[in-house]
């Protein structure tokens, strides 16, 4: 597998914490140490690379011939970390999916969902757990080249509700844009607010 991560501190702090280390076999700790120090781990069964740095540029370091059955994007919310929710970055992510590959995220933001739809991905709502019934969504699943006959029924996902579909026609669905691929979050948010102000 490949991972993209900008901040080494959580893993560094975890590996220094005895309570964390005691949760895992030494083999797992060795893998995590290698990832932290070297950015990769290899043995006969496991091959993993973690590319430390800005995901917008690091994604290009994944070899062109490698695509994924599943991509999980576990970033902060678009308002806090818009860099990884832009049209430009999500388009790069889509290109790394295999045919009928899946993209999954905790985000259910209208701007994210509208961008995924505009990238010709079929999107589904991830149902909240029973103990989180007060929430209307637990995230978004997007599938490339969706073929219902080849996809098993999944009790954890559902089509978007009428309310969710209507939400994609509001100003909230205006996407985040980063045409230069390296703009700071403040600039990306400012650009979107300007676009929203001109939207009817």
For every predicted segment, state its role.
Residues 42-43, 138-200:
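SAM/dcSAM-binding transferase cores
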Residues 83-99:
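A short glycine-rich, Lys/Arg-flanked "PGG" loop and its adjoining helix->strand segment in the class I
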Residues 7, 109:
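Conserved SAM/SAH-binding beta-strand->alpha-helix loop
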Residues 113-138:
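Conserved Class I S-adenosyl-L-methionine
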Residues 70-72, 99-107:
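Conserved beta-strand signature within the Rossmann-like core of class I S-adenosyl-L-methionine
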Residues 60-70:
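A short acidic, Gly/Pro-enriched loop at the edge of an enzyme's catalytic core
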Residues 13-62:
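S-adenosyl-L-methionine
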Residues 1-5:
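Conserved SAM-binding motif I beta-strand of class I
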């Amino acid at each position: 597998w490949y991972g993209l991560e900008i901040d080494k501190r959580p893993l560094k702090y975890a590996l220094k914490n005895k309570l964390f280390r005691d949760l895992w076999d030494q083999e797992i700790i060795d893998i995590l140490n290698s990832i932290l120090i070297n950015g990769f781990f290899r043995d006969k069964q496991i091959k993993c690379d973690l590319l430390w740095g800005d995901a917008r540029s690091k994604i290009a370091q994944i070899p062109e011939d490698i695509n994924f059955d599943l991509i999980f994007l576990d970033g902060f919310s678009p308002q806090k970390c818009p860099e990884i929710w832009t049209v430009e970055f999500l388009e790069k992510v889509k290109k790394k999916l295999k045919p009928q590959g899946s993209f999954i995220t905790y985000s259910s933001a209208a701007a994210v969902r509208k961008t995924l739809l505009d990238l010709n991905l079929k999107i589904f709502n991830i149902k909240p757990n029973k103990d989180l019934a007060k929430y209307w969504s637990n995230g978004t699943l997007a599938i490339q080249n969706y073929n219902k006959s080849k996809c098993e029924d999944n009790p954890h996902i559902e089509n978007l509700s009428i309310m969710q579909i209507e939400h994609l026609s509001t100003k909230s669905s205006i996407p985040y844009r980063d045409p230069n691929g390296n703009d700071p979050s403040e600039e990306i948010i400012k650009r979107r607010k300007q676009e929203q102000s001109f939207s009817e």
